[in-house]
């Protein structure tokens, strides 16, 4: 799964259609590292009002060693996620999204990748998505959309960092509290084959206080359970799968190569709505599995190592407009 495909899944999760589903009000904290389930839908009570959500986040993945190789790695990320919904009636809307994230990778003695021990230093990931969700009768809905993603290390060629994707899916809402769906996301990759992945959509308001929902943000997708003891607080436990891939520096140890990472985060998040338009978030998590891959400019694998599990902490703030 590429970063671009993660972005498509994020847009698909955001674009859930059907009868209004109560929202827990907690967007992701850390672009797939630490956060609450993404908001699954927009209610119809806002009429024709344009809805926007802006999330700013930061996180740190603590140092972990490589399995069967020398060295260790830690990661620090900062970024933003912007989601805009332009309603077209009660259950239809145009959807726009823009995500930006910068990551610093601190490799120490990782000589299994390159002799210098530092296969790459940083990565910037940018993603723009556009889509449309609509209704078919009282219970069925659909979503279609596309995105373009640029991901590159400082000094990497921007044109060679672009990937493109699209998605399509259907949802069925049996009631105001339960929506199920299935779709397909397709994405090009950097020096690799096109990838197509089916994705589920689930939003189940078990009670006034409990929500089970699939989530998607720009770097991953998964399933979360949220508890809302009151209107101000939300506590979420979630697990998922995330990925990143990016074009490397033209003058680096592997010129124009590709760096890839996969991870399986398990996270606990607390979100505090201090104002109807402002929510503070803090999360702690565990990278249960991590994998780092280094490819050359033609996509040939040079090295691939799993990393040990690692602690993750993240903070964020969401503004709604």
Language model: regions and residue ranges:
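Transmembrane beta-barrel strands of outer-membrane/channel proteins
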Residues: 52-62, 96-102, 144-150, 182-186, ...
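Repeated loop/turn-to-beta-strand initiation elements of outer-membrane beta-barrel proteins
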Residues: 90-96, 138-142, 176-182, 209-213, ...
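Short glycine/proline- and aromatic-enriched beta-strand/turn motifs that initiate or cap beta-hairpins
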Residues: 15-112, 213-218, 235, 246-249
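Hydrophobic, lipid-facing positions within transmembrane beta-strands of outer-membrane proteins
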Residues: 76-82, 124-130, 146-150, 162-168, ...
